[in-house]
């Protein structure tokens, strides 16, 4: 069976390139981030990498204190609601929202005035610069709030039915921590034996798919938002798709 890998393209979406070996190959994007002087200001740390495991990078100072405060403020202005999972396709083209007992956080989406806010725009441009993937491939920022004892049990960001959508599936998650948490609230990757501690300005980047088969979920990056024990945790999440997400989404596709 022919295998494929994802090749980073600064000018557009990822390209699928045939390779002769079905072995997992590293994303060129991750190699570029780690090796390029351009990104050293974000202090990229390799937490996991092939061949031992999937790529997992951690950054520091990806967003400033001012930017973090503004995103928290924008989330408060929009209003946080109970987080839900994406459900079944409805006759009107939308998807139902399913409450999940394993997910007790609250969130909102950076749309309308938030989407055009200069700081939100700047943050999304920075993610585009780091990943080399157009902002159009990303869902709107999801702004999250975890209060005491709130959590999100082990899960993957990969959504199978999106394979049949023009957007393709989520291939990458870029998660940013907007504040320090007094206790708890880490992001755990159980299959990698890794837990990332929340810290303002810190970010984590990982793939949801296999490099040699970007249509298939990589279960090794299943992760869990551990319960907040003391304080409140704020975060911002960018889910990046194989192809343009925003245009088909606006068209109801």
Functional labels for PLM-detected ranges:
Residues 1-205, 209-253:
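Fe(II)/2-oxoglutarate oxygenase catalytic core
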């Amino acid at each position: 069976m022919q295998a494929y890998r994802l090749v980073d393209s600064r000018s557009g979406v990822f390209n699928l390139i045939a390779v002769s070996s079905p072995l997992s190959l590293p994303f060129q994007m991750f190699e570029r981030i780690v090796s390029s002087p351009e990104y050293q200001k974000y202090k990229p740390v390799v937490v996991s990498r092939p061949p031992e495991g999937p790529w997992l990078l951690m950054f520091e100072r990806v967003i400033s204190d001012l930017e973090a405060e503004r995103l928290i403020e924008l989330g408060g202005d929009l209003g946080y609601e109970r987080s839900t999972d994406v459900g079944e396709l409805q006759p009107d083209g939308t998807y139902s929202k399913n409450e999940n007992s394993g997910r007790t956080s609250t969130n909102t989406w950076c749309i309308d005035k938030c989407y055009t806010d200069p700081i939100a725009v700047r943050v999304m441009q920075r993610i585009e610069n780091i990943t080399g993937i157009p902002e159009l491939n990303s869902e709107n920022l999801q702004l999250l709030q975890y209060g005491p004892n709130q959590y999100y049990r082990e899960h993957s960001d990969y959504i199978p039915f999106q394979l049949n959508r023009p957007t393709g599936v989520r291939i990458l998650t870029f998660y940013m921590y907007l504040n320090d948490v007094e206790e708890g609230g880490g992001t755990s990757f159980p299959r990698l034996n890794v837990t990332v501690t929340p810290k303002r300005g810190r970010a984590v980047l990982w793939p949801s798919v296999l490099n040699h088969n970007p249509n298939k979920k990589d279960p090794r990056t299943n992760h869990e938002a551990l319960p907040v024990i003391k304080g409140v945790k704020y975060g911002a999440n960018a889910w990046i798709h194989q192809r343009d997400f925003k245009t088909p989404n606006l068209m109801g596709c």
